[in-house]
Amino acid sequence: MNKIINNVFAREILDSRGYPTIEVEIELCDGAIGRASVPSGASTGKLEALELRDQDEKRYCGKGVLKAVQAVNGIIADEIIGMNAADQNAIDKALIELDGTKNKSKLGANATLGVSLAVAKAAANSFKMPLYRYLGGKQTSVMPVPLINIINGGVHADNKLDFQEFMILPVGAETFSEAIRISAEVFHNLRSILKKKGYSTNVGDEGGFAPNIESTEEALDLIIYAIESAGYSAQSDFALGLDVASSTFYEDGIYEFESKGLTSEELTEYYCNLVERYPIISIEDAMSEDDYEGWKLLTAKLGNKIQLVGDDLFVTNCELICKGIEEKMANAVLIKPNQIGTLTETFAAIEMAKSNGYKAVVSHRSGETEDTTISHIAVASNCGQIKTGSLSRSDRLAKYNELMRIESTLGKDAKYYRGLAWVL
């Protein structure tokens, strides 16, 4: 009986952009407490679960979350107080049924996710287990390759770059801690290079630099120069990744990219050319979420060569992932818990991807908090990849630091992910 939920409390806090988000605390009868806060995205998929905002322009420019807070402290608390926190499936089923909508629009996915994560943390604390072990079991040991965003563009930065994220993947590291060290060295070398060239070294939402450079190729060239300046190889030590966020520049069947209007076929050829010229092994949201034919074409062309990640295409939703698998769109799924709204549904999406030969990449959002749950999800699921921003801004570093703690705790049992070797 000591795992029974005794108290539920939610409050409004601020995320990394200074906008409100929800934080939830769950207390069990044995005194164990779990606390979780929920992130928020800037570029969002059309079919994501709803993030409930107050729309009261007199508070926080309409972005308050008091409605979500009230839902947790009222109807949700009434439902789950007295339930067993160790039965995550039952808790999440109750949340889904209480909401009763397909996209969590009644209670808000921010409310349901905050509760779902806090319950899991409370149960883990009650069992005196780290969250990754509680969620993943004894076989949990794989440390993820980080996809580290070191140049920001698109809606994450105020510059001319259309692509949203330019990432380094430290695939040649022996351990996660080494991966972070060598990536930090590249990050600081890039800062010095940008400064010498007269570019701004201010950072964007996710901690990457946001210089006002002119083209995708220039960004990639700068990153390769930074890798080599740090004493590493862009062939064996590091690979490159992109988050194109192409839905943000897609309209009426045309991609408005770098002052050119490109068809799906033309954009696919552009990607093929980039992959030939640069050590790119992962491209996210290369086509718009609405451009199914473009996705099929791209996957046919590059799907056996590099990782093609669907974010807006799948929004961590098993129904959409199943459709993508059936129609041969992409070969990897980005996993964002707040796109779906419960921990159970998050793990179901990961399992659906993995069981069908798709990779899974656990991800943050551009508006983050100091919450480190996604670090534990990445390890618990053995998915092998995590995307959680750059090597600046404490909201991003919190996740990396937590992963280094986990690796230290695992000791010799920790295994750095090698599942990206097929694309090298």
Swiss-Prot record:
PROSITE patterns to which the protein is assigned, alphabetical? ENOLASE
The record lists (2R)-2-phosphoglycerate as bound by Q164, K336, R365, S366, K387
Catalytic positions? E206, K336
| Keywords, sorted A to Z | Cytoplasm, Glycolysis, Lyase, Magnesium, Metal-binding, Secreted
The EC number on file is 4.2.1.11
The residues the entry assigns to the signal sequence are: none
Q: Main location per UniProt? A: cytoplasm
User: Per the similarity annotation, which family is this?
Assistant: Belongs to the enolase family.
Name of protein: Enolase
Instruction: Provide the species name.
Output: Wolbachia sp. subsp. Drosophila simulans (strain wRi)
